[in-house]
Amino acid sequence: MTAQYYQLDEKFNQQTYEQYGKGLALNDLYIRRGASGSLVFNQDQQISGIFFAVASHSDPKPGEKTLVQLLRLPVDESTTATVKDNCVPYDLIFGNRNTTHYYTQFAKQHHTHLYEQIQQSNDQLIKFIDRKNVSCSMVS
């Protein structure tokens, strides 16, 4: 299995849709249609993304891509030079210092269940949303 970064511009019913954020296009994964929403784990068994599409209109065949929406893309000292040159730290849920709109901002404003969980958590990786100066520190 190989992975690559992609930008998705898809036409469906005469409308063009763009994929925002960071994602992966995985070759030879053979996840079938209907599996959208399935979790994708990294080598450390941490959730890294959510499977959302097959890049064809039928079940995947050898060499075809399945698409994953990344939840986080850390850029730190362990990140390869190729990724560092093309990416900034990214976090779909918590944002980063350059993000103006992100999910936990909405959760805080509307006092959602997720925000209650954040407030009750002792995990500093998710508590940083309460700090005034949101940092870019993220885990892989």
Curated annotation (Swiss-Prot):
Entry's Gene Ontology molecular function annotations: ATP binding; RNA binding; RNA helicase activity
A Pfam short name: Peptidase_S7
InterPro entries documented for this protein: Flavi_NS3_S7, Uncharacterised_MG067
Family, similarity comment: Belongs to the MG067/MG068/MG395 family.
Entry protein name: Uncharacterized protein MPN_580
